[in-house]
């Protein structure tokens, strides 16, 4: 079995009686005992960051850091930013970390510091798993964004050089002393720091070593020493003088974006754009209302391998449970994955082996533990996902639209090559746009039954179908209809499967009453993966200002929020957290590439040469 690309945890120990954390591998402390004060005097004051935050207007300020460590720099800067920046300003904090602190140790650190720096609570709750690559989290209702790279700093910065359109406003170079961690202070890193900077970009570091000063100077920075007595003799501050070789131009995000489709995918996109300061025309067709499922589970559909698709699913799941957690329509009480359907007991054991050391977000449980968490006697164990959510889709859509920058509009005639970006999120109806015909997207109907169960589980169960608690009882289902079934067929299918699955997994008699149903139509791609990113012309080139989020199928609660962040980040000059292989799994370009080999299938049409 191919393993997921994971990173090693830091070897952490406590120095002196004041509890300053120390890296055993590098024999160096993460920060002084007066950590928050040290952050201010070394990394903020020399660059006048508080003043710059206050003058940020409605723009995004980008801070980048080498060495995430205990997250102290991030927490102090986030707290300062929220306290003094205008309400319309945003902070994008980018950090790289080769050896992240393990989850139990980070949780203990966060618990101690959250009293003074509350962002620690939110970060510890959704601390990224040890999956190599980028992770993103949002705080303070979207005003503060953390993009965290797990891996070598050189790889993380090189990826930013390739993909980020915005320049960095300020650098925090905080990767242990050069003598103890020389790889962090290579000339190649300084060159990439310069490539990601523009004239006036500042940098601060605790180190005053000549190697550090010379590296910054060779990269185009003007360097000065900062008196740090009585704490130490000097630290270093610098500003970028500019160069002809690669500093990024000033980036301007679009002032307005049109989102076609106001269901779950479109409303997620609209909210992600609005929280990044863009006005959104959210086009809602009342003739095609979104399916409002009262209780949809956020179930990751984990894969037991190290493929790009496995990484993409895990990244999507962990991001989405974090993002959805702040809305009233979401209840994060966990989900229990049981044997059933394709997820046999041996396959669940493979999944447990694959993910057991990547954090507390998943764990294998036996039948006794399963009974304890669900409140019903269980015949089998399974995989417990403690942070998984249940979402009231209709309520969530209404919540997502409640933002002053989102403006609901009725459909209008399609414009040709609009000057402002347009994002298509119309589900199965997306095939009506001529330029989307190559996407291999099909409508698949489905139905779930609403039942009342005497003595039912208190957590959602997924396996051979699902049993999900909601305010009025339970939802069970659902059918998967390539063409709509005759009336009553879906009800019989769902209830028969529900009764059989209950008998095989729950050690108690089933007493229930069917009380209703919900029908809807999913947009499903031929490979069951969503479509996220630009639309493409017949040559495979991305169409200017034309993007898409669709094909979320039965798992829109996982992929739709994640897709929204990927698209909004790119439009705001940031970057998607997907690596190139993961992006290929969700790009619509994959269909054009397959069609070049085997022709059109699954109802696909050649893409239009022009719009209209």
Predicted feature locations:
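Short beta-strand to alpha-helix junction loop
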Residues: 204, 305-316, 342-344, 382-399, ...
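Active-site substrate-recognition segment that forms the wall
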Residues: 244-276, 285, 292-297, 302, ...
């Amino acid at each position: 079995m191919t393993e997921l690309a994971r990173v090693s945890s830091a070897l952490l120990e406590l120095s002196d009686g004041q509890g300053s954390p120390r890296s055993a591998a590098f024999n160096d402390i993460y920060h002084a005992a007066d950590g928050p004060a040290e952050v201010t005097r070394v990394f903020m004051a020399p660059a006048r960051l508080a003043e710059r935050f206050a003058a940020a207007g409605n723009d995004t300020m980008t801070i980048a850091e080498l060495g995430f460590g205990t997250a102290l720099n991030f927490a102090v800067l986030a707290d300062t930013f929220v306290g003094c920046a205008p309400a319309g300003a945003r902070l994008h904090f980018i950090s790289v970390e080769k050896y992240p602190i393990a989850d139990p140790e980070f949780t203990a650190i966060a618990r101690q510091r959250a009293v003074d720096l509350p962002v620690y609570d939110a970060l510890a709750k959704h601390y990224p798993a040890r999956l190599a690559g980028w992770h993103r989290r949002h705080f303070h209702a979207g005003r503060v964004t953390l993009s965290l790279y797990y891996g070598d700093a050189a790889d993380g910065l090189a990826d930013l050089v390739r993909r980020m359109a915005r320049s960095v406003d300020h650098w925090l170079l905080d990767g242990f002393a050069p003598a103890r961690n020389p790889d962090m202070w290579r000339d190649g890193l300084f060159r990439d720091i310069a490539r990601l900077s523009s004239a006036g970009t500042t940098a601060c570091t605790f180190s005053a070593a000549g190697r550090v000063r010379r590296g910054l100077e060779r990269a185009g920075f003007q360097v000065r020493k900062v008196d740090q007595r009585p704490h130490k003799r000097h630290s270093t501050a610098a500003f970028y003088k500019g160069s002809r070789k690669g500093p990024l131009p000033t980036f301007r995000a679009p002032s307005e974006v049109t989102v076609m489709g106001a269901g779950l995918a479109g409303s997620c996109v609209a909210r992600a754009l609005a929280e990044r300061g863009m006005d959104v025309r959210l086009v809602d067709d009342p003739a095609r209302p979104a399916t409002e499922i009262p209780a949809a589970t956020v179930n990751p559909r984990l894969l037991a391998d190290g493929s790009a698709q496995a990484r993409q699913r895990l990244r999507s799941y962990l991001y989405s449970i974090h993002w959805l957690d702040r809305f009233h329509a979401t209840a994060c009480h966990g989900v229990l994955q049981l044997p059933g359907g394709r997820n046999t007991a041996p396959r669940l054991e493979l999944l447990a082996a694959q993910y057991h050391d990547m954090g507390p977000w998943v764990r294998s449980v036996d039948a006794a533990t399963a009974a304890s968490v669900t409140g019903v006697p269980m015949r089998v164990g399974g995989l417990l996902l403690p942070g998984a959510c249940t979402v009231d889709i209709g309520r969530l859509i209404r919540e997502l639209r409640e933002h002053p920058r989102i403006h609901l509009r009725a459909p209008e005639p399609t414009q040709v090559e609009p000057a402002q970006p347009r994002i298509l999120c119309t589900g199965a109806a997306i095939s009506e746009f001529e330029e989307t015909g190559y996407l291999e997207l099909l409508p698949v109907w489905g139905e779930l039954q609403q039942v009342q169960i005497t003595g039912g589980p208190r957590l959602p169960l997924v396996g051979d179908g699902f049993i999900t608690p909601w305010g009025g009882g339970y939802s069970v289902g659902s059918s998967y209809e390539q063409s709509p079934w005759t009336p009553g067929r879906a009800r019989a299918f769902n209830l028969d499967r529900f009764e059989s699955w209950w008998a095989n997994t729950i050690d108690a008699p089933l007493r229930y009453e069917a009380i209703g149903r919900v029908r809807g139509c999913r947009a499903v791609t031929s490979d069951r993966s969503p479509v996220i990113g630009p639309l493409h012309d017949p040559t495979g080139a991305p169409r200017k200002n034309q993007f898409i989020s669709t094909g979320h199928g039965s798992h829109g609660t996982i992929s739709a929020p994640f897709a929204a962040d990927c698209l909004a980040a790119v439009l705001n000059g940031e970057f998607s957290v997907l690596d190139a292989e993961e992006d290929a799994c969700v790009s619509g370009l994959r269909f054009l590439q397959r069609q070049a080999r085997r022709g059109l299938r699954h109802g696909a049409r050649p893409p239009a040469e022009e719009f209209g």
